């Protein structure tokens, strides 16, 4: 499953909106992630756009982040992930991996992993979005998380990332 980020288009929304409407910014960002996934999918044969319900199968799947988050609700019917700028592609990817009990999650980044002792520290250094560590620490078991810097050769499993820190 590939969860594509929003990139520069989301950064522009963040700069232009400056907390005017956090929920709208959140959903616009998810829509951009989905549009980026569709664009990236066009470069691969035999890919599938996925949302929920999702059935694990072999193949290359791209997540429709907007639709997945729209369908991902708490018992009270509220969206599972907060509708704020604290939630971006990192948290969406982790939530999907938790939801479908994936054993591993690979975060593809454009910077090296910072000198961090846990995910909260990595959030504070803007390596992952601000909700990531809260989502991570809310689960007893998580996928093993690897980070890969696409602009260098760094591939790491930062810490025992499959359990709460």
Model region roles, listed by residue range:
Residues 13-100, 123-124:
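Ligand-binding beta-strand-loop-alpha-helix segment within the catalytic cores
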Residues 2-8:
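Glycine-rich beta-strand-to-loop/alpha-helix junction loops that act as flexible
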Residues 99-117, 148:
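Glycine-rich phosphate/pyrophosphate-binding loops
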Residues 47, 100-102, 138-144:
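Structural alpha-beta junctions
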Residues 67-70, 92, 110-113, 150-152:
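Short acidic/polar capping segments at secondary-structure boundaries
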Residues 1, 60-64, 106:
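Structural motif
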Residues 84, 91, 119-165:
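Polyanion-binding loop/helix "lid" in catalytic or ligand-binding cores
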Residues 8-12, 113-115, 152-155:
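Short, active-site-adjacent cap segments at secondary-structure transitions
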């Amino acid at each position: 499953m590939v969860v594509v980020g929003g990139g520069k288009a989301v950064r522009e929304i963040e700069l232009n909106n400056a907390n005017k409407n956090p929920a709208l910014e959140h959903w616009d960002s998810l829509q951009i992630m989905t549009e980026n996934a569709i664009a990236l999918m066009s470069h691969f044969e035999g890919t599938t756009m996925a949302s929920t319900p999702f059935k694990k199968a072999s193949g290359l799947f791209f997540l429709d982040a907007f639709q997945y988050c729209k369908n991902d609700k708490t018992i009270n019917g509220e969206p599972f992930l907060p509708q704020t700028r604290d939630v971006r592609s990192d948290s969406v990817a982790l939530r999907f991996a938790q939801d479908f009990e994936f054993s591993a999650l690979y975060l593809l980044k454009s910077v090296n992993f910072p000198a961090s002792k846990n995910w909260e520290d990595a959030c504070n250094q803007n390596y992952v979005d601000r909700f990531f560590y809260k989502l991570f620490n809310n689960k007893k078991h998580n996928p093993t998380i690897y980070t890969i810097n696409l602009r260098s050769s760094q591939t790491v499993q930062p810490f025992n990332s499959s359990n709460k820190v």
